[in-house]
């Protein structure tokens, strides 16, 4: 239904540019495309009578605003089943003790259906209109995830995980099996016939794939012009193992396989070296910043400002279940926290060991509007889908959240636009996200 929303509208246009319209409007056509946005609805309607005719008006309250939907650039869908568990050990131990045994269960179709229905429901409830999902090694259950995203109306990139080495015997495949299943998955997703759900090539991480498998996956991505997702430089032990096996840097291992493209998003990037950052920029790759899991699994503090200034696109990832929440809003807060912690290290030298090479008195903390960019347009750009979604530019799909800051505790006074956004970011939850839209279709209505 063609609709015009009348009230406060906010979005970002770049990492440093936040735009808002108090008492503004946003118009959406029957196809779910944004056809008008700005301050003066009546002036727009007068100059666009054909578009304005027949629009249903929706009036927002003083405590409501429209914003773009959240983008989760990195989430492990099967690990939703162990959310909040096993976060007392570092990455490699956590994988072997908790995660690999869990993911092996997804050979059971009924179990996979139950979990995947739950994770799509939960992420949509929290305002995630676009997610980049890792599934498991299993072809059929990964197709189940794709079908579930289509059924519930979520925009998604979905990958069948590939791993043929350095994995437990009960959860490993041969390179031939991995390539065959990946090709079958790509074809299976395309047969679903939905432009909302797309396949993405997914080597789990460099350690879990042989050089031959990585190269084969790079070839498939090139042949079909596919998205690519994996992990990079999350944990110091992991990095040293990669260097020992591949005799190059972590980024170099992927680059030699043809896996670094302008459709590649790599999770974490906590310990990237300067030449790796430069390589990612040249290749047009992006990083999914996962501050929650980087903290939970004791991986480190990722310097987002360094990546952005180095020309690398950055989005946010929940990294469920290394991260303990499916909410990108929660991750947004954690990103701000990590930036403050880095500020402590760089300016206050709290290590107590004299001048540290990490010291930087010119470091600038992330601001909440910059973090909002990372959670929306930055994420869409990181996933190479910013031509479709991420903000309210004309012609894009209407992927949006209707936020109401008065749902739980009504403010004692009227708030400015900036205050509305800031209050939601710092004190809000999924309860404040009263409506969710994907491609113009209402997915959630009312507090659930």
UniProtKB/Swiss-Prot annotation:
Q: What is this protein called?
A: Guanine deaminase
Q: Report the cofactors.
A: Zn(2+)
Q: Give a brief account of the activity's temperature dependence.
A: Optimum temperature is 40 degrees Celsius.
Q: Which residues bind Zn(2+)?
A: 74, 76, 231, 319
Sites where the protein binds substrate? 76-79, 204-205, 231-234, 319
Q: What EC class does the entry list?
A: hydrolase
Zinc as a keyword of this entry, yes or no, is yes
Entry's pH dependence statement: Optimum pH is 7.5.
């Amino acid at each position: 239904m063609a609709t015009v929303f009348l009230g406060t509208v906010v979005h970002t246009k770049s990492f440093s540019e936040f735009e808002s319209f108090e008492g503004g409007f946003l118009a959406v056509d029957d196809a779910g495309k944004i056809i008008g946005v700005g301050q003066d609805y009546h002036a727009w309607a007068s100059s666009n009578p054909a578009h304005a005719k027949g629009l249903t008006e929706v009036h927002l309250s003083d405590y409501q605003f429209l914003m773009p939907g959240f983008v989760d650039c990195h989430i492990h869908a099967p690990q939703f089943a162990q959310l909040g568990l096993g976060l007392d050990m570092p990455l490699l131990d956590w994988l072997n003790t908790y995660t690999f045994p869990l993911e092996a269960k997804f050979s059971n179709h009924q179990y996979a259906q139950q979990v995947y229905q739950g994770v799509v429901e939960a992420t949509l409830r929290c305002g995630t209109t676009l997610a980049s999902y890792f599934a498991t090694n299993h072809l059929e259950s990964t197709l189940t995830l794709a079908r579930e995203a289509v059924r519930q109306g979520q925009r998604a990139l979905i990958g069948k995980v590939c791993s043929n080495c350095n994995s437990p015997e009960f959860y490993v495949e041969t390179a031939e099996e991995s390539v065959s299943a990946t090709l079958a998955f790509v074809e299976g997703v395309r047969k679903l016939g939905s432009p909302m759900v797309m396949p993405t090539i997914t080597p789990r991480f460099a350690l879990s794939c042989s050089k031959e498998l990585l190269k084969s996956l790079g070839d498939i991505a090139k042949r079909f012009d596919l998205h690519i997702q994996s992990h990079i430089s999350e944990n110091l032990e992991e990095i040293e193992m990669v260097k020992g096996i591949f005799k190059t840097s972590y980024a170099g291992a992927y680059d030699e396989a043809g896996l670094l493209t302008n459709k590649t998003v790599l999770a974490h990037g906590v310990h990237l070296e300067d030449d790796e950052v430069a390589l990612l920029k040249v290749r047009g790759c992006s990083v999914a910043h996962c501050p929650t899991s980087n903290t939970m699994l004791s991986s480190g503090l990722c310097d987002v400002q360094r990546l952005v200034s180095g020309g690398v696109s950055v989005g946010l990832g929940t990294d469920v279940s290394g991260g303990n929440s499916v909410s990108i809003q929660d991750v947004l807060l954690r990103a701000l926290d990590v930036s403050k912690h880095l500020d402590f290290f760089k300016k206050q030298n709290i290590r107590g060991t004299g001048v540290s090479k990490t010291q930087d008195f010119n470091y600038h903390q992330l601001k909440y509007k910059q973090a909002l960019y990372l959670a929306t347009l930055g994420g869409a750009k990181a996933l190479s889908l910013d031509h479709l979604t991420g903000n309210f530019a004309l012609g894009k799909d209407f992927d949006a959240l209707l936020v109401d800051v008065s749902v739980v505790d009504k403010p004692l006074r009227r708030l400015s636009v900036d205050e509305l956004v800031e209050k939601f970011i710092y004190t809000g939850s999924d309860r404040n996200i009263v409506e969710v839209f994907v491609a113009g279709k209402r997915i959630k209505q009312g507090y659930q």
